[in-house]
Regions:
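Short, small-residue-biased leader/transition segments that mark boundaries at the very start
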Residues: 1-6
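A bilobed periplasmic-binding-protein/Venus flytrap-type ligand-binding module shared by bacterial periplasmic
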Residues: 7, 100-114
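Bilobed "Venus flytrap"/periplasmic-binding protein-like clamshell domains
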Residues: 7-45, 125
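Short secondary-structure boundary segments
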Residues: 11, 75-77, 107
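Periplasmic-binding protein-like
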Residues: 17-24, 122-142
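Short amphipathic alpha-helical coupling segments at ligand-binding clamshell hinges
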Residues: 18, 111-121
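Short helices/loops that flank or line small-molecule/ion binding pockets
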Residues: 20-22, 42-72, 77
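Short beta-strand->loop
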Residues: 69-70, 82-96
């Protein structure tokens, strides 16, 4: 991607850092610390192709495709725009991503029967199959 323009969201620093980490993972640039979710453009230590990184609100990214060569897009916005991340993406976070959604409860509530039942249901093979069928690889179960 010579002289590619990349977009990321300044209004959402967490996902901006995730985007840079993905670009590092893809070998397009190198960050000081490719595990630092708070990474910004200032943390790029190597940009051998002089990519221009333009920041844009995450929800606008799918609409910007005609103006750029490459964009980093959150899965929810990609799906809303009719994209198929499993086919359209060059790089995706995998099930080992530390940014997977989690089930969180207050300390002391983790052993409540209804919480245990919910966790068991949400992490079942039935739910895994539902995710696979519904999202066709765009969302990867992290359990």
């Amino acid at each position: 991607f010579p002289y590619t323009t990349l977009f990321r969201s300044p209004n959402d620093p967490t996902n901006g850092g995730r985007a840079l980490i993905l670009l590092d993972k893809a070998g397009l640039l190198k960050l000081k610390d490719n595990k630092n979710i708070a990474s910004t453009k200032a943390d790029i230590v190597e940009n051998p192709h002089n990519y221009q990184i333009v920041e844009l609100e995450a929800a606008q990214l799918p609409r910007s495709f005609e103006d750029v060569d490459l964009a980093t897009v959150n899965t929810n916005y990609a799906l809303e725009a009719g994209l198929n991340p499993a086919k359209d993406a060059l790089v995706l976070e995998d099930k080992e991503s530390p940014y997977a959604n989690i089930i969180a409860v207050r300390q002391g509530d983790e052993n409540r029967p209804e919480i245990q039942k919910l966790v068991k249901a949400l992490q079942s093979e039935e739910i895994k199959k539902f995710i696979a069928e519904k999202y066709k690889g765009a969302i990867v179960p992290a359990f």
